[in-house]
């Protein structure tokens, strides 16, 4: 959305930094980066950690945090800066939390659903709703809960780019087993260390 990259932008499967023990970071599911060039779309399709971190570094964690909290509804879960009772400081404004999901408190399923819906709603963030309306016994509207019309993306093309990448994920990427016969699907997988948690967030555009 910032005009910095597109799905076809070439990036490299390589570590960005070294960790405290001198090991390259990030790794790809415990494997060393290959150093090969690939498109951002290919990185998303194959869930390559190094590509996610390279792109986040291009965008900057601060800009990404601001976008998520101000335009995609994640303001209640993401931690800007928190000082704990023992004096330690925590923040989600960094590469690992925002590029790889290593968040301080995590996010909710509802927030993820709201964020993903932006990709199939022409870039508009409509929020999330538990109900649309309530009728009385005669069919009169008692309560109505209309969707929001806040702009998630400045450029609607960004939503289309992301949707195209996520359609590749379900077509032939890490979520290729989630296709539904006769229905278009798109989504993104995510795992924690040793596959303790396995996530999939998807849409049917």
Predicted regions and their residues:
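A short secondary-structure junction motif
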Residues: 18, 47, 71-76, 122, ...
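Structured DNA-binding interfaces in DNA transaction proteins
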Residues: 20, 101, 128
